[in-house]
Amino acid sequence: MNRRSSAAGDTERSEAVQWIDRSIIVCLFLFAAAAPHSIAATQTAWLIGMLLWVVRFAFYPVPVFHKSPLDYALLGFFILTGLSAFLSYEPMVSIGKLRAASLFTIVYLFAQNIPSRRVVRLLALTLLASCMINVLYTAGQRLVGRGVKIQGLTVGSPLYAAGVRPGDTLLEIDGQKLNDPEGLINLLVIPNKQPAALKAYRLENFPTFKVERGKLLAGSDPLERLGVEGWSKGRDWRASGFYGHYVSYAEVLQLILALTVGLFVALPAKRSWIGALLTIAFLGFCFSLVLTITRASWGAFLISSTVILLLGAGRRAILIVGLLVVPLVLAGLFFLQQKRNVGFFDQTDNSTTWRQTVWREGFDLLVSKPRHLLVGIGMDSMKGHWREWGMFDNGRLPRGHMHSNLLQLALERGVPALILWLVLLGLYAVMLLRLTRDLRDSNDSRGSEQPLGPWIDRGIVLGALGGMIGFFASGLVHYNWGDSEVVMVFYFMMGLTLALKRLVDLRTAKT
């Protein structure tokens, strides 16, 4: 009787373990599918997956925790981050930011729970396929356009008197979206002493103009009454996908583009339907990245692609790509000049000059006290103390962060934390280089021509390495480590490669 009860209990535990393990895998795929689109959905998948993983430890057999070369650096960096939070000028604010810092557990959720190399490959392809959805969305937005772009304006126009100029795209009036000039007329003819609030887009800015009502010109159609000489749909804004900001979108695209390039370089038969699909994805991601008009991410993409080609492609392929890149770079520079009215390296650009200002202020604050060098000022404590520290040109510049991973980490968490972060990236790069070599030198060529063959493993590693280097390069002028959407994709790639290393090492040990 006891044996039967014990057997029944073992069966129930076995079924529960299988259910939990499968549910964790589902969460991993939901994470990969949501990462290019929604921070809320991605973090929900992460939290549910983490909860299930913790519950899994309550059942026999207890999961084995596999060590990795990055464990000490990851945990040490988080510990130093926590220490800086508790010693912060604003402890409660900084401690609240530890939730974002705990996103590093994404690495372990993937690294410890992926059961096979096939799942690694499917997760990487899920990320790519899902990202194509926001590429189509971005293309659809451009095709449809938005608002009313003013092509010409008479001096006597009530819009001109309010400050509107040719080239502006009118988006909303009194909170209502504009689709055509008739929408303007309908609200400007209403008798009201209060002027209408007209929101517009002008070269990255969203000014609001106060337009007096009842000042329309005489005319037989809306354009004549508004003093507008011509209009079209606006298509000038910077693409942001489903995110709220174009920089987040650009940085995520850079990481996913690196994965795409890595897979294509590793693909044995490039003239195949798989090669065609990867080419389509590559062109789509490039299209969206260009529309973000984000110089640092463009440069990061070029750097990451160069690294991947040097490590994975032959000389002939590198030469061909190099020749193709030149016209693309020139076209990108022209597009940048047309859409943002700046050059790639432009000392007259406001975003460049105020970066230089906050870098100087941040460095001065960092070295002003030994405490700042050791443990930093604490995450987000600057929001409550920028006035007393005279930051952001005493409030005349946009208040936010230091626009550099290196300076931001040193200032908020201390120089030791920055050093450990650099060690983490260095160890990660070394691991990826060794894994690339191991996969290249392995004798496992069986199935290399299959859609889900071993070539994908090498492509993932090449993409992760290139993406990491591009991420670091872009982070010299962006604080992309503080962007959760970007960091989650970065940790996702790190988790995939750690899982792949574990599975490759296990196979090697068996042989």
Where are the predicted features?
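Transmembrane signal-anchor hairpin modules in multi-pass inner-membrane enzymes, especially those
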Residues: 1-93, 105-106, 112-121, 125-128, ...
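Transmembrane alpha-helices of multi-pass inner-membrane enzymes
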Residues: 48-54, 258, 302-305, 317-318, ...
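A membrane-periplasm/extracellular boundary helix in multi-pass inner-membrane enzymes
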Residues: 129, 136, 140-146, 283-286, ...
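PDZ/PDZ-like domain segments forming the peptide/carboxylate-binding groove
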Residues: 144-180
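PDZ-domain C-terminal substructure recognizer with occasional recognition of PDZ-binding tails
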Residues: 185-229
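Long extracytoplasmic/lumenal interhelical loops at the membrane interface
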Residues: 233, 346-360, 373-413, 434-436
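A conserved mid-to-late transmembrane alpha helix and its immediate loop/hinge
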Residues: 240-248, 394-432, 473
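Hydrophobic transmembrane alpha-helices and their immediate junctions
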Residues: 260, 264, 272, 413-469
